[in-house]
């Protein structure tokens, strides 16, 4: 059997606030092969890590990351109070990509990364790729985006390892030829659409499988990588494959 890669979603976000160094460190400590994170550029062109452009959901503050300087972003508290209460209040901050790469360098230099480009500009890609190459980790990255133009730019300029999504989920979709792999969410994996997209012959990343039943379904469907918010069931099954 080909290796099944295990990936933590936004770190290990079932345990710690998503896209924080605590969450990434938890994923590393749990032993996943990779973890996924989301990149935006600050107003002063620093790549920072958060899923939403508006920090309201995880930080409780309305705004737009691209309109905030790094100094302003560092004042946010991404403790995700709605999910975790006060457990992490004052203990986390919005990390930069460089801070994440320093963590990986110190804790797990061979870590693989799922790099989700959230801001659909070539500048965002260029700045992120330059930093990943500086740390010698570019060749251990998958690059994700819900935008066909960005996927194609990554492939044509950098020959990056790309993963896009089904056509109906993409912005600016222009074909699958720039995809190395395809990302299928759980509702697709559980539907007859899964067979349709698997027939395209692309290795499939399936997400997010947080129960043993969902993990096994993804394996049975032929996943090459499975992403989980809670990697524990995934890791338990993967170790016995």
Regions from the PLM with identified roles:
Residues 1-241:
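Phosphate-group recognition and catalysis centered on beta-loop-alpha active-site segments
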